[in-house]
Swiss-Prot record:
Pfam families to which the protein is assigned, alphabetical: RecO_C, RecO_N
High-level lineage: Bacteria, Pseudomonadati, Pseudomonadota, Gammaproteobacteria, Lysobacterales
Function: Involved in DNA repair and RecF pathway recombination.
Gene (UniProt): recO
UniProt cross-references to PANTHER family, sorted A to Z: DNA REPAIR PROTEIN RECO
Family label: Belongs to the RecO family.
InterPro entries: ARFGAP/RecO, DNA_rep/recomb_RecO_N, NA-bd_OB-fold, RecO, RecO_C
Record key words, sorted: DNA damage, DNA recombination, DNA repair
Protein name from the UniProt record: DNA repair protein RecO
Domain of life where this protein originates: Bacteria
Any GO BP: double-strand break repair
One GO CC annotation: bacterial nucleoid
Amino acid sequence: MLIEHERGFVLHVRAWRETSLLVEVLTEQHGRVGLLARGVQGPRKQALRAALQPLQLIQFSAVQRGELAQLRQAEALDTAPRLAGDTMLAGFYIGELLLRLAPRHDPVPELYACYAQARRHLASDLPLAWGLRRFERDVLEGLGFAFDLQHDSEGQPIDPAARYRLDPQDGALRVLSERLAQDRRETVTGAALLALGQDVMPDADDMPGLRRSMRGVLLHHLGGRGLKSWEMLEDLARRR
């Protein structure tokens, strides 16, 4: 199959043999595509190597043969965000999450839109943690894994003053008061869930619980195997 003039975001790149690269690209029309870029070393290939970098939006043509497509041509369509520190790790995270969750050769246009929006947010003044929670919410929705952010698992309106445990299958499970002390780290406030559903940034005190709860849901859909970027973020937090 010939893929011509397709737009895509570079999610991940690694060396293959001495002069080639294996590149994972997220496209709107073809889903996640694995590309084999042969012979990209040398001064005459500098522009191509520069285009095949994570976060870069490219236009490419390739021939699909089996699992990998043979790259014929690629060019950068813009300048990827220049990131450092926490935002650089966040860029690694959004790419790794979609690398694991986006199906190969199965287009999910919503995931393409999610990545494009998250990429813009990384280069903006939007609070980083809030941008990532919105990204996670939208990825789950795009994959058909969204849960109700207005009602709990029993169909009752979410109480902003209560705490909930997010279950990947059942959604928000209200935590009984007698269990609250032992479950506090594993729960999120109703106020944070309502805010997430309304696309309004929760209070700063509610953000850690929302992060942990969303991570638990994502971990389920990742098959119980976490992300390297999570380990890197936790290691960075311990050093601070």
